[in-house]
UniProtKB/Swiss-Prot annotation:
Residues 65-139 are annotated as: Domain II. Residues 144-193 are annotated as: Domain III. HAMAP family: DNA_HJ_migration_RuvA. InterPro entries: DNA_helicase_Holl-junc_RuvA_I, Hlx-hairpin-Hlx_DNA-bd_motif, NA-bd_OB-fold, RuvA, RuvA_2-like, RuvA_C, RuvA_C_sf. Residues 1-64 are annotated as: Domain I. SMART domains: HhH1. GO terms for cellular component: cytoplasm; Holliday junction helicase complex; Holliday junction resolvase complex. Residues 139-143 are annotated as: Flexible linker. This is Holliday junction branch migration complex subunit RuvA. It comes from Polynucleobacter necessarius subsp. necessarius (strain STIR1). The gene is ruvA.
């Protein structure tokens, strides 16, 4: 449908923006993380979008990054999580924090988001496990660091540690560590735990 919108930012009324594209103005709902990255009104912007058609409304949601949009799409697939709740989650925590909370099964972190209760948080942890990029939040975002952390994670899993234990150990390893040093540091951390 509508995958991207490019135009002039007319106004901002959180969480809604008004974007003018060739004389047509679109209302776009965005998470706070995207809102913080916006330029001043009157400037050009580009947003990745998700277009949702329901029997009573048509809505356009905008995101600064592909990871935000993909996280939103994964969230709205979950029973009981609508677009407003998904926006609240992405406004209350970054995609990296969400991925970490899901990977570590920390429902308590999710309940800190307004509108997310204990049951919804547990459902999010259960249904999103393995669906968000596993490297998010583990490394600083550098391709080599992500590859290294992925290798270290796989090695710790192959050695019989649970995903939760391996991810906790991975958090203790600096991003610029080599694979062999990372495995060694991870094993050292896990032997103390």
């Amino acid at each position: 449908m509508i995958g991207r919108i490019q135009g002039t930012l007319v106004s901002v009324h959180p969480p809604r923006l008004l974007v003018d594209c060739q004389g047509i103005s679109y209302e776009v709902d965005v998470p706070m993380s995207t809102l913080y990255q916006l330029p001043q009104a009157g400037q050009k912007i580009t947003l990745l979008t998700h277009f949702q058609v329901r029997e009573d409304a048509q809505q356009l949601f905008g995101f600064a990054t592909e990871t935000e949009r993909e996280a939103f799409r994964q969230l709205i697939k979950i029973s009981g999580v609508g677009s407003r709740t998904a926006l609240a989650v992405l406004s209350g925590m970054s995609v990296n924090e969400l991925a970490q909370a899901i990977a570590l099964q920390e429902a308590g972190r999710l309940t800190q988001v307004p509108g997310i209760g204990k049951r919804t948080a547990e459902r999010l942890c259960l249904e999103l496990k393995g669906k968000l990029a596993p490297d998010l939040g583990v490394a600083g975002g550098k391709p080599q660091a992500i590859e290294t952390s992925s290798e270290v994670l796989q090695a710790l899993l192959a050695l019989g540690y649970s995903e939760k234990e391996a991810l906790l150990a991975l958090k203790q390893i600096p991003a610029d560590t080599s694979i062999s040093d990372g495995i060694r540091m991870g094993l050292k951390y896990l032997s103390k735990a």
